[in-house]
Amino acid sequence: MDKAVLDDVIRRLLEGKGGKQVQLSESEIRQLCVHARQIFLSQPILLELRAPMRVCGDIHGQYQDLLRLFEYGGYPPAANYLFLGDYVDRGKQSLETICLLLAYKIRYPDKIFLLRGNHEEAKINRIYGFYDECKRRFNVRLWKIFTDCFNCLPVSALIDDKILCMHGGLSPELESLDQIKEIQRPTEIPDSGLLCDLLWSDPDSSIEGWAESDRGVSCTFGPDVVAEFLDKNDLDLVCRGHQVVEDGYEFFAKRRLVTIFSAPNYGGEFDNAGALLSVDDSLVCSFEILKPADRASGSSSKMNFKKPPKMGKI
């Protein structure tokens, strides 16, 4: 995809502030999906990334809040970004949201990284809004092209060999990170098993071990599971999205797992803040908060993680 064309697409998308709809052509969106899909498949399913990195949780079609996140954190390529999935559904502007992220991915493939969420899956976004938005603004064919692209997204990322990121959480099947590398793409999300859990599971402070999930899919896991997994794999932190949390971020398991959610006033039904996690090159984590009412930002908690020796470029 020509850089000038791509830059023009990005420029038009960035003009969509204040809730203004940006209508790209069907051909442009198709090109975004096809080119991004090729890049996703050319990069590992378990991304190995280097700090500094800004980490964002669920966006869910809240395009104005995505633009606000970039205003706070810096527009690519000024900063490196990792998104934890759930770009579409529920919000009013799923198309603008996913198109801007795909355009940035193509333009700056080593500066912005997109993981798969449980909503980047046909049988889910068929129901929760993305299908209807595609059909209303374009056609069902285009929705199917997005499905082909989503089926190639990576599912996990490792920052400096110490911070493991995914959309959902851990799995009773996951013992070694090498198992993630063995997942073949393109793939749909199965109803059970490792890939399902990575995108669907949740922490639960009231249990030990594993339990069934109220979602009716996947499972929940206790703080003991987090500690055991991190110790066994010489990791410091699990970073995930998937759940609305009041302050935009929430720690679990003695600060060894953090949930990041980046859609403030989620769906217009919650009074939650959104958060942007910044990991500096010493693995100090700090949070930028998008408040629900006035959307004012403010930095919050900081914590240190031991940085491993540099082993050359990965």
Swiss-Prot record:
CDD domains found in the cross-reference section: MPP_PP1_PPKL
Reaction equations catalysed: O-phospho-L-seryl-[protein] + H2O = L-seryl-[protein] + phosphate; O-phospho-L-threonyl-[protein] + H2O = L-threonyl-[protein] + phosphate
Enzyme Commission identifier(s): 3.1.3.16
Binding site for Mn(2+) 1: D58, H60, D86
Catalytic class of the enzyme: hydrolase
A Pfam family that the UniProt record links to this protein: Metallophos
Lineage top rank: taxon: Eukaryota
Induction and repression of expression: By stress.
Region listing for Disordered, in residue ranges: 295-314
Co-factor binding details: Binds 2 manganese ions per subunit.
Active site: H119
Gene Ontology terms: cellular component: cytoplasm; nucleus
Keyword Metal-binding tagged: yes
Biased composition (Basic residues): 304-314
GO molecular function terms noted in the UniProt entry: metal ion binding; protein serine/threonine phosphatase activity
InterPro entries per UniProt: Calcineurin-like_PHP_ApaH, Metallo-depent_PP-like, PP1_catalytic_subunit, Ser/Thr-sp_prot-phosphatase, STPPase_N
Named cofactor requirement(s): Mn(2+)
UniProt entry keywords in alphabetical sequence: Hydrolase, Manganese, Metal-binding, Protein phosphatase, Stress response
Binding-site positions, Mn(2+) 2: D86, N118, H167, H242
Sequence similarity: Belongs to the PPP phosphatase family. PP-1 subfamily.
Name the UniProt record assigns to this protein: Serine/threonine-protein phosphatase PP1
